[in-house]
């Protein structure tokens, strides 16, 4: 597996994990972000950044961003995003 494939696989896995909660569970903590250390599927030591951001106005869809990079080379990292849409019938306030 190439370095890029390895970082992408780790980012996809983390993005899937980051999107396991629904909009209502994440909304009360948005905006939020964190960085932690971990390992890729191929065993590389990397940093994972996870962020939950409003995709527009507060209370709109939530954009989830995951970046995976080797500590010495942020610019060569992989960044993936996904949206968690707001349920139009969800009447909870943020």
What are these regions (language model features)?
Residues 1-94:
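Flexible, low-complexity segments enriched in proline/glycine/serine and punctuated by aromatic residues
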């Amino acid at each position: 597996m190439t370095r890029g494939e390895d970082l992408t696989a780790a980012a996809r896995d983390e993005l899937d994990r980051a999107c396991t909660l629904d909009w209502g569970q994440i909304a009360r903590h948005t905006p939020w972000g964190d960085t932690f250390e971990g390992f890729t599927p191929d065993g590389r030591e990397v940093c994972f950044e996870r962020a939950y951001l409003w995709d527009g106005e507060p209370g709109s869809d939530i954009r989830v961003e995951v970046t995976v990079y080797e500590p010495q080379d942020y610019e060569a990292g992989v960044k993936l995003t996904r949206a968690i849409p707001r349920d139009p019938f969800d009447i909870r306030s943020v």
